[in-house]
Each structure stands twice: as structure tokens, then as C-alpha cells.
Amino acid sequence: MLATDSDPIVAIATASGRGGIGVVRLSLGRAGEAAARALSDALCGARLMPRHASYVPFLDGAGEPLDRGIALYFPAPHSYTGEHVIELQGHGGPIVLQLLLQRCLDAGRAHGLRLAEPGEFTRRAFLNDKLDLAQAEAVADLIEASSEAAARSAGRSLDGAFSRDIHALVDDVIALRMLVEATLDFPEEEIDFLEAADARGKLAHIRERLAHVLGDARQGALLREGLSVVLAGQPNVGKSSLLNALAGAELAIVTPIAGTTRDKVAQTIQIEGIPLHIIDTAGLRETEDEVEKIGIARTWGEIERADVVLHLLDARSGLGPGDEAIAARFPDGVPVVRVLNKTDLTGAPASVTRTGGGAARADVCEVRLSAKRGDGIDLLRGELLRIAGWQAGAESVYLARERHLIALRAAQAHLARAAEHAEQNAQALDLFAEELRLAQERLNSITGEFTSDDLLGVIFSRFCIGK
């Protein structure tokens, strides 16, 4: 904990701009109840009753009203931050809110009141055990949710669903560790611990539960992060038309002139609540046009960063030499969907053919469609969800972040090594115990039991001020 984590702080807690209601929030830290009484008198002209809504004037330094509204006082520890908290709910004009904020700073100067940093209220809720770290992150995720599914999943994380699953796993690991440590402490008993305590069975159960939690976390991360989809191919194969068809709007210019798109056009759409970040790129070809060359170089940069590449071809000609040269340059490890567009000119029906192989970079499927008529667009959407790993009905999962996935995978690896040591019976019991300890440490990092101040600084700096 930093020394400044106990400073009294204040901030405007509502979004910038005009609105019906604006909120100024104070969390009084070490200044405590004495500051709460003094600020109640100075700002509202009255002593605020705990947990009661009081309709009062908000006073300036001369005792004149700046505004009138609702004042709320939450004594510690029964508040969002776990500290003494005052909230002033007035009208949402930016000028009156700035005046009220400055008045709070002036009135609280003797108590060391300062402006809050981004995420500092939620950081204090974490430090004062009102939220664990996964729940604190869910606050920001709920605010930033881009779909109903993401909002509901963030709400479940905030309610503690993710944390409860993690704590249950940790409890099981601790219980198994206790048995192992007891056996290491009393080797003279000569008991076959692994058999007597069914350690292998207990470990298998923990690994199975962890795999389930990791699967749910992957779904939640997909809701939060989405999928980057790059449209690539030669000029005039219908990339811009496909972007417009997927987005349901005319976002990109479509002409019969090759090379119309010279720079990327990006649009985020949603499919079943999953954000798809679709990028239409310049057509890939040999050219002497310097501007087009820059666009083509950027196209390859986007392809390198993509989660999925849609390789567009003209259904009339199929895969030609130029297309083969493009396909050969696609990076390993990036799924490629071969899209044969313009089926309206061939008379062929829309269809999907699964072609996935075992190579590091393989065409996972082939979709025949008409971007112009919309035939087969739903088939393509379905394939994108399948490639992303989205499971129908997975909206009940909790929202997760990349750091959670990293920690879960690391814990999974430690438990896998523990299982290997278990096969060596008592000869590797100390290594078995160590892998359990490391798995527990990685799981605890998710909820914040073992977390550095540097990581906390990064996490909470991404919040808005006043939250």
C-alpha cells in the first residue's frame, strides 16, 4: 500500500458533459469522521445523517447556494471504498459541477483533500477488502461493456461468480497441499500417501474443475476483447462489399475500379454479443503507385496482427496464381477462411466446406457467398463464431481478461507437472508439493492475494476518474 492510499480524495463521479444529474464523490481516508462532520457543515450547512438522503443546498465559501440536491453520507466501513464517503448529487451541468468540485477542495484543504486519480475509489475498495481484484476489474469492464452479453457477464464477475470459482479451486489445492506437507513432515509413518489419501484422484478433480473455469474464462475474454478479422485479397474481389454486408451499412466505397481502397477501413460489429473488429484493406497486387504501395504494406501489417483472415477470391475464377502467392505469405498460426465471393454471377448456392488441417497455418474452411445479394453472409458469421470458439448459450459466463487467462494456463501447467510427479510416488513428493504451491500462487494472483503494486497501478490507471 502506498502512503497516498489514505489521502482524502474527491472527484466528479459522473461522465463529462451535460446531464440531468451530476455526482461529486468524496472518500475521506485517514481524515475520517472528523472531516466528514466538518465537510457536511461547510458544504451543506447541516450535519448529514448516516445512510439518509438529505435534500440540501450546496454552499459556496460565502454560504451562498451553488446548487441544491441530494447529499448522502456513508460512514466507514459501510461504503463503496470502506472509508467515510460523502456523495453530492446535483444537476449535471459541467460548470456547476466544476464549481462544486473546487468548493470541496477549498473546504477540505485543511484535511489534505486532493483530486482523485483514475480508478482510485475502486483501488481503495480493493485495498479495504470491499472487492477482490477480479471484482474491481469487473467494475471497469461493466462500464466499458459494448454488448448486453458483455454487460451481463461483467455483472456476474462483479457479483463474485468468477472469484468464487477461483477461491473454490484454491481451497481444494490448499487441502491437497496440507496432506502432502503432513506426509513430508512425518516420513517415519511410512504410509503410501498417494494411495491412502487418493491424492491422484483429488488432483484429477482439481484439474477437471480448472479446465472448466478456463473454458468459461476464454468465453468471457472473447466477449471483452472480440476478434480481429482482416479482409484480404486481390483488388476488385469484393472486400469492401463484404465489409458493408457484414456491417449492414455502406461504410466502404464500392466501385468497379481496381485499387479503390488504398487504406484500411475499420468497423466493429457484433455477432451474438461478440465484438468483431473488421478491417477492409487495400487490394494485394504489384503496383507502381506509391500511395497504393503504402496501403498494401499496411495491409500486410494488419494481416500479421489478425485473429482471422478472410481471403477473398472471385468465385468465377477461383484460386489463381496471384491468389496462391498471397496465400503463401499468410503468417503461420492465423486461421484463414477462403471466401469465394460473387456467387450471384455463377449461379452456385451459398455453402460452407470445412477444410481445416493439422498445419500451423491452414485454411480452416471455404465459404461461397454473394456479398452483393447477402447470400451466405449468415454462414460466414457462423464460421467466424466457430473459429473464435464461441459456444451458444455461453452468455452465462463471467467476463475475463488476458491476464486471467495467463494465470489460469500457468496454474494448469503446474498441476500437469504435479500429476507427472505423482506417478513417481514418494520419490518426488517434495516436487509434487512445490507444483501445488506454484499453482495456488497463480490462482491467487487473479483475485489479488499476491499482486505487486506495479500491477495494481496499471490496472487501476485504466479506470475513469471518479470510479
From Swiss-Prot:
The keyword Hydrolase applies. GO terms for cellular component: cytosol. Mg(2+) binds at residues 240, 261. One of its GO terms (biological process) is tRNA methylation. One of its GO terms (molecular function) is GTP binding. Keywords: Cytoplasm, GTP-binding, Hydrolase, Magnesium, Metal-binding, Nucleotide-binding, Potassium, tRNA processing. GTP binds at residues 236-241, 255-261, 280-283. HAMAP family: GTPase_MnmE (MF_00379). This is tRNA modification GTPase MnmE.
